[in-house]
Regions:
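The feature marks helicase ATPase cores and/or their adjacent C-terminal helical subdomains
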Residues: 1-640
Length: 640
C-alpha cells in the first residue's frame, strides 16, 4: 500500500514535536516518507525516534488504513514505549487503539503466542511469565528431586543455578541449556527424564520464564501455521526501534510471525549492540545492504567528535557532525601509575577551561568498560577510590514521601519495566494508610486489596486513579516535578476515599525533604566526583558504559580499563584512524563498547590513557585530530 506524505503534513508534525524554529533533516524526512521494507541505520544522536514518532502521527491522520489494518511498533523497553506515547498521545489518541499495537517484543510474543498456546494446551490461563518468579518456583522444587539432584549437586557452578538455566528447546520442546542448544544430557537417562517431568509440571502449574515463553511460541506456530496469516492480516506495517538490541531468537520468531504482506522497517545502530541478550551473545540484526537507508547526520555532537566515533565502527557507517554545535578538539589525558587518581580532577579542570560548567543543562560523566576492582590491573575504581559499582539492593520502605519518588536509570528500568515506579507509588500510599492506622478488616492493605477497595467503593474515581499512576510514573522517570501533585493527592482525594485524619506522623512523612538512599532492585549510584576551582564546581558522575547507553552528556571522559588487555591500547589504531577489518570477538566487543561510550558527549570528548599505552604514538594521535594533555606525566599539554 503506497502512502504519500506531503510537506504540510511533515510541517504539522514538526510543530508538535520540535521547538519553534527547529526542523527535521532531509534524512529524517526521507525515512518518514518511506513505506518499503528497510533497514534504517541511524547514527548516535540522529533523531531516529523523533522521525519514527512523526511518521506515526502522520499515519494516525490517514486511518483507517486499507482493510482496516493496523500498525505494530516494537521497542525493547517499556520506558521507550512510554516515551513514544508521551510524544504522540496528546496529538493522536487513536494511534494506540486496536488494530494497532505498541509494546515490547516480549510482551507481544507473550500476549499473542505464548498465552494462547498455554490456554490451548492446558485449558486454563497462565499465572506468571517472569524470570524471578520462575526461579523461585524452581528453588522450592529443587529439594524434591531424587536421582537428578545428585547429578546437579556435583556441578561446579551449583546445581540450583544450573537447573534454573535449563530451557525448553525452541525446535522440539526438549530440555537444553540454551533455547536453541542440544539436550543437556542424554534423553534416556534418569536425570533427563526427571528434569523433563519437573519442567512440564511447573509449566502446568502456570509458571514460565521469558525464554520458555519463546519456546512455547515456536511450538504454537509449528502446530498452528495459520496464526501467521491471521497476525499478518491485522498489521500492514511493523516498525522495530533499537533493532540492534534484538536477539537472534527474537528475530527468528518475528520472521515466523509476519509474512511478505507486511512491510517491516528495522531502525537502529548495529554498532551499538553491546548487550548479551540474556545468553544470546549475537545481535540478531542481519542488515540487508540492498535495502538500507541511513540517517548519518548527528544532532548531538560536532564534526570533531563525529570523525573520532566513525573510526570505531565495526560495521561501516558514515557519521556527520552537527555544524551548529561548538567545536572542541577531543582530548587525550595521559597519566602514569602515580597520577591515575588525578585524572578526574584534570577532566574537571578541562571542563571549566572550556566554560562547559556554565551550560544550562550540563551533564558530566566519566565512564569505563569494567567497573569491578581488579587485583593488578586498572578498572574504574583505580581512578577514584570512592567508586562503588552500581549494585541492586532491596529496599521497599522509606521514612518520607520524596524517597518513593526518585527517578532511576534507563538500565534499571530496562531490567524491571516501568512497573517499578507504579509499585513504588503504591507502596507510598500503603505507607500512608499504615501511618494513620487504616487496615482492611483488621488486616494491612496490599497493592491488590488497595485497587480492589477503590474499584468497589469509588468506581468513578478508579479510572482517574489508574491514569494518574501512569502519568506520575512517566514524570518521575523524566525527572519532572511530581512531589507537590502527589502530596496534594494524599491530603485530599486519597484522604477522602479512606476517611482518615492527617496526623502529625503523616505530615512528617509527607513534608520531610531528605531523600533516602536505596531502591528496590534498582541500580543505585552515588558515584559523584566533585571538582572545585575557586568558586567554580562541577559534579562528575562516574559510571559504566552499559549504564549510560542512550544518554547524552555535555562532556564525557572515557576511562581506559582492563579486559584481557587495556581497551584503549587494543583499539589505538582505530582511534588514530588506521584500523580496518576488525575480527575476533574481543576486538569487536571492545570497538562497540568504545563506540557507545565515546558517542555520548555533545560538546567535549576526553579519553584517559596510561602513558605506557601510547608511548611513541603521540604524533600520530595529534595528526589525527586529538589534543594531548601531558600535565599528569610531567609534560606540557600539546594542542593542535
Amino acid at each position: 500500500m503506497q502512502i504519500n506524505i506531503t510537506d504540510n503534513e511533515i510541517s504539522w508534525a514538526e510543530r508538535i514535536l520540535l521547538s519553534p524554529g527547529k526542523h527535521l533533516s532531509d534524512e529524517q524526512k526521507a525515512v518518514i516518507r518511506c513505506f518499503e521494507n528497510k533497514d534504517i541505520i541511524a547514527c548516535p544522536g540522529s533523531g531516529k525516534t523523533t522521525a519514527l514518532v512523526a511518521k506515526l502521527l502522520i499515519l494516525s491522520r490517514k486511518k483507517p488504513l486499507k482493510n482496516n489494518r493496523g500498525i505494530c511498533v516494537f521497542t525493547h523497553t517499556n520506558v521507550a514505549i512510554n516515551e513514544i506515547k508521551d510524544h504522540a498521545l496528546f496529538a493522536s489518541q487513536n494511534l494506540f487503539n486496536y488494530p494497532n499495537y505498541f509494546g515490547t517484543i516480549q510482551c507481544f510474543i507473550d500476549k499473542y503466542l505464548a498465552i494462547p498456546a498455554y490456554i490451548l494446551k492446558f485449558n486454563k490461563r497462565l499465572r506468571y511469565i517472569d524470570n524471578e518468579v520462575f526461579n523461585s518456583v524452581i528453588e522450592r522444587s529443587y529439594n524434591s528431586l531424587h536421582s537428578a539432584k545428585a547429578w546437579f549437586d556435583k556441578r561446579r557452578e551449583g546445581g540450583l543455578e544450573y537447573l534454573q538455566r535449563l530451557r525448553f528447546n525452541k525446535d522440539n520442546f526438549g530440555i537444553s541449556l540454551k533455547i536453541d542448544g542440544r539436550e543437556f544430557i542424554g534423553i534416556d537417562t534418569p536425570t533427563y527424564r526427571e528434569i523433563n517431568c519437573l519442567k512440564l509440571r511447573i509449566l502446568k502449574w502456570g509458571y514460565l520464564c521469558y525464554k520458555d515463553a519463546y519456546s512455547l511460541a515456536f511450538e504454537y506456530l509449528r502446530e498452528h501455521p495459520g496464526v501467521r496469516g491471521f497476525i499478518s492480516k491485522r498489521f500492514a506495517y511493523v516498525f522495530i526501534d533499537e533493532m540492534q538490541d534484538s536477539s537472534t531468537i527474537q528475530v527468528e520468531l518475528l520472521n515466523k510471525i509476519f509474512n511478505d504482506n507486511v512491510v517491516i522497517q528495522k531502525i537502529g545502530d548495529i554498532n551499538q549492540s553491546i548487550f548479551d541478550y540474556d545468553g544470546d551473545l549475537e545481535c540478531g540484526w542481519t542488515i540487508n545492504n540492498s535495502r538500507t537507508m541511513c540517517i548519518a547526520g548527528s544532532k548531538r555532537f560536532p564534526s570533531s567528535i563525529a570523525s573520532k566515533v566513525e573510526r570505531l565502527c565495526v560495521h561501516q557507517q558514515t557519521i556527520t557532525g552537527n555544524g551548529r554545535q561548538t567545536e572542541i578538539t577531543p582530548m587525550i589525558i595521559v597519566y602514569n601509575d602515580s597520577t591515575v587518581q588525578q585524572v578526574l580532577s584534570k577532566y574537571g579542570e578541562i571542563i571549566i577551561r572550556n566554560n562547559l560548567h556554565q551550560n544550562d543543562k550540563r551533564i558530566f560523566k566519566a565512564i569505563g568498560w569494567r567497573g569491578k576492582p581488579h587485583d593488578r590491573e586498572r578498572t574504574i575504581p583505580s581512578y577514584w577510590n570512592d567508586y562503588s559499582k552500581e549494585v541492586k539492593i532491596r529496599r521497599t520502605e522509606f521514612n518520607n514521601l520524596k524517597s518513593y519518588l526518585d527517578s532511576q536509570s534507563d538500565d534499571s528500568i530496562y531490567s524491571q519495566g516501568v512497573n517499578f515506579y507504579r509499585r513504588r507509588l503504591v507502596e507510598a500510599f500503603l505507607k500512608c494508610l499504615r501511618i494513620v492506622g487504616i487496615p482492611e478488616n483488621g488486616r494491612t492493605f496490599t497493592d491488590k486489596k488497595l485497587n480492589k477497595y477503590i474499584l468497589e467503593n469509588r468506581p468513578n474515581f478508579y479510572k482517574d486513579f489508574r491514569i494518574n499512576l501512569a502519568k506520575w510514573c512517566m514524570k518521575i522517570h523524566r525527572k519532572e516535578e511530581v512531589y507537590e501533585e502527589i502530596k496534594n493527592f494524599i491530603t485530599n482525594e486519597f484522604k477522602n476515599i479512606f476517611n482518615f485524619d492527617v496526623n502529625s506522623e503523616l505530615l512528617s512523612f509527607i513534608n520531610s525533604t531528605n531523600s533516602e538512599e536505596g531502591n528496590e532492585g534498582a541500580i543505585c549510584s552515588n558515584n559523584i566526583y566533585k571538582y572545585s576551582s575557586g568558586e567554580d564546581e562541577v559534579n562528575i558522575e562516574v559510571s559504566t558504559i552499559h549504564n549510560v547507553k542512550g544518554e547524552t552528556h555535555t562532556a564525557t571522559c572515557y576511562l581506559e580499563t582492563y579486559f584481557r588487555d587495556y581497551d584503549i591500547k587494543r583499539i589505538l589504531d582505530f582511534i588514530i584512524g588506521n584500523g580496518n577489518n576488525p575480527n575476533g570477538k574481543v576486538l569487536i566487543k571492545n570497538l562497540k563498547m568504545s563506540f557507545v561510550g565515546m558517542s555520548r558527549p555533545s560538546h567535549l570528548l576526553c579519553v584517559a590513557i596510561h602513558n605506557d599505552n601510547i608511548l611513541g604514538r603521540e604524533e600520530e594521535l595529534r595528526n589525527s585530530g586529538w589534543d594531548i594533555n601531558n600535565d599528569l606525566v610531567g609534560g606540557m599539554a600539546v594542542y593542535n
